[in-house]
Amino acid sequence: MYRYYITSVVIFLVFSLICGMALAEDHSEKLSVVAVGDNLIHPVVYHDAQHSDGTFNFKPMYSNIKKDIASPDLAFVNQESPLGGDDIPFSGFKRFNTPSQVAGDIVATGFDVINGANNHSLD
């Protein structure tokens, strides 16, 4: 029994030493993040982005921030108004529905993560 106890203690100490040495190594890396909140598309905004053929182009609206979005490692935007599809009429407050083309234009601007979980998710 004593031999089993000593063997267990030695094994525990060896593994503790090995684990401690692995933790001592510095593997830290830095991540730069930019976050934008409340990309809320009211009717005046999507009407401004609408072309005569019914398509939408939101890219000019994001052109002033494109360079600021490009430099961080991760760019996050909170898409406040839902993209409910083109079969449902586009609308603003209180029951938002935003043209789906805004998603592609947000990605083209340089955003990596688009959040859709917010208080307008079920509009």
Feature roles, as predicted:
Residues 1-9:
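Bacterial N-terminal signal peptides that target proteins for export
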Residues 8-18:
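Bacterial N-terminal signal peptides
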Residues 20-123:
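Acidic, metal/ion-coordinating pockets
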